Structure formats: C-alpha cells, structure tokens
C-alpha cells in the first residue's frame, strides 16, 4: 500500500486545489448535528444536493440476486455479425469511458502521469486481445449519470466504471459477463460513533447521485438525510469536513477511501450484492462477445487474480471472479 500512498498525496493535493477554486452556490442548510459549528460555513462539493430524510426510492430495491438474462458467449466473428467490432479494429484504438478519481479502481496517478487501477488494467487487457497492444486505448472520463448516454451516442466504445447490472440499465445498455462482485457496506469516520445501521437515523449519509446506490440508501436508511454528490471523492471530502457522517457504497469503492483516509472504518455487515460489468452499446453483439472472450481469458490465465492482488487484496471485495453469466441463445445446443 505504501507505493500507492505516495502518488495519492499528490492527487489529493491537486483535488484540494480544484475544490478550493470552485464557485460558491446557494446550498441547503445541513441538519442539526451533521456538522460542527466550525464546519458549517464550508460549502458542499460542487453540484452536491442535500435531501431531507424520508424521500422515497424511485424503484424497488432487491438486495441480493440478479434479474438479468445474461450476456452473449464468446465466439469467432461471423459474416452476418454487426460491424462494430471491425470498425474498432480498423480505427486501431479502443475508446473506453472510465473514472479518473476512484482510487484502486480507476484513478490518475499524478506522479506517474497515467491512469491506473483494476478497471484501467481490464481496459488494457481488452485492447491487448484486440490489437496485441495493451496501450492501444484512448480513455475518456465519464461520470455516473452520463455512462449510458455516451454509449448510445457512440462517443465511447465501452464503459468500465463500476457499472452494476440492473434490469433498468440492461434495457438501455448491453453488458458483458460480470468482472467483479461487490458488497454494499457502510464507511464512517471512526470518531462519529457509527457501529451499525442502527446508528444511522438522523445522521447524514453520502452517496453519488443517479446511481443504483441512491435507491439502496433511501430504502435502507429512510430516516437519514442524504447528501448526493457527483463523485465518491466528493463523498469522502464531505465526511472529512463533517458535512456527512457516513458513506454507503460498494466495498470495492470503499476500499479506495479506506486507503486514502485511515481515520475511517468499513462496517462488516453486507447490505446488498452488486455485479460490475462492461457497458457496451445495444446491438453491438460482436463487441460484447469480444469483451467476454477477454474476461474468460484473464480468468483462466491468472491475470484476473494478479490484478486483484495488486489492487484489491486489502479490501473486503470477493477475491474470486464472479460466475460467468450467459443467456441461452437460439441454436446453441444444435
């Protein structure tokens, strides 16, 4: 972890400078007890919104299990396949939407001047199989709210950004078989007196807006005000500035926060299960099959386990690849 910490200090310094230059905006007053008097004047992160307790989730939340038909099995390209994969090959570069500040998963290492993390390595492995060159990748930074839109508009070929599979998303985006299984947990500063979900009522919980986790928070913590931010790094900053008391997120995400801030702790209870998959435009079946071929290859040749050991070995994330999830296709058994 020490080799990651050096680059992190520089990254945090840059992030702090950017946040310090952000314009102030009219913000809702924090509820009593969510912040000390000394921190009340600090503005919330740019674009953040604070909801009072009791706001209803927008859709039903299923804590475990996955209502999804599955992905498409890898197979050699056929003449009648869609042209998407061939167009990527002709371009000679894979355009991938990623995060730039999700430590351990996908973040900019300011010392090395490059993107690093588990999801970044997955993108490079896909490029390796496409072009025999893991560096043949152009990264585009995307936020949670724009992932499906950018895929639909063709501005990225694929998205690898902690994109969990849900029925609602699967109606708009094609998914690979999952590459990571994560459990939803609670992270809180050790000085806030939060030891379980029972301590959350009237305490402000932070979550990234327009994610599946927002529904989870509103379902499982109905008596907590909810701070909605643009990024998980903003959530971590909000807890450090006493604008939030806890963060609810996947343990793969929380692992990066814990590494950044040793004055926090992740509670042991798992609240839900999520499966991360590569997002791909609908009807781009050839790309789905190619990505799944890479996921199968890194599972079998030890690459997945090497990536996990390098980036997530200190986390509570499941240390084994999730099961392959494929749908039954016509003529599959003929």
Question: PLM features: residue spans?
Answer:
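Beta->alpha turn/N-cap motifs
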Residues: 98-103, 140-145, 154-166, 190, ...
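Short loop->beta-strand "edge-of-pocket" segments that line small-molecule binding or catalytic clefts
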Residues: 94-98, 116, 197-213
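Acidic, polar ligand-binding/catalytic clefts
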Residues: 124, 128, 135-199
């Amino acid at each position: 972890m020490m080799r990651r910490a050096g680059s992190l200090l520089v990254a945090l310094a840059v992030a702090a400078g950017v946040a310090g230059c952000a314009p102030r905006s009219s913000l809702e007053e924090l509820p009593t007890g969510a912040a000390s008097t000394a921190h009340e004047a600090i503005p919330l992160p740019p674009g953040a919104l604070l909801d009072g307790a009791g706001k209803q989730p927008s859709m039903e939340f299923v804590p475990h299990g996955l209502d999804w038909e599955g992905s498409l099995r890898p197979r050699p390209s056929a003449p009648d396949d869609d042209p998407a994969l061939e167009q990527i090959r002709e371009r000679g570069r894979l355009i991938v939407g990623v995060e730039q500040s999700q430590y351990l998963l996908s973040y900019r290492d300011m010392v090395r001047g490059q993107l690093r993390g588990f999801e970044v390595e997955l993108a490079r492995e896909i490029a390796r199989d496409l072009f025999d060159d893991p560096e043949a990748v152009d990264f585009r930074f995307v936020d949670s709210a724009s992932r499906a839109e950018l895929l639909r508009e063709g501005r990225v070929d694929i998205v690898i950004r902690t994109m969990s599979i849900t029925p609602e998303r699967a109606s708009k985006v094609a998914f690979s078989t999952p590459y990571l299984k994560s459990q939803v947990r609670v992270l809180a500063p050790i000085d806030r007196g939060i030891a379980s979900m029972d301590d959350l009522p009237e305490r402000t919980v932070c979550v990234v807006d327009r994610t599946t986790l927002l529904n989870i928070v509103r379902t499982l913590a109905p008596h907590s005000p909810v701070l909605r931010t643009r990024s998980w790094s903003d959530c971590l900053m909000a807890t450090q500035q006493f604008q939030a008391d806890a963060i609810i997120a996947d343990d793969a995400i929380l692992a990066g926060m814990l590494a950044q801030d040793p004055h926090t702790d992740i509670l042991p209870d798992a609240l839900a299960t999520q499966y991360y998959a590569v997002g791909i435009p609908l009807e781009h079946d050839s790309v789905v099959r190619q990505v799944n071929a890479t996921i199968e290859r890194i599972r079998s040749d030890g690459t997945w386990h090497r990536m996990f050991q390098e980036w997530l070995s200190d986390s509570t994330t499941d240390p084994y690849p999730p099961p392959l999830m494929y749908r039954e296709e016509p003529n599959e058994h003929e």
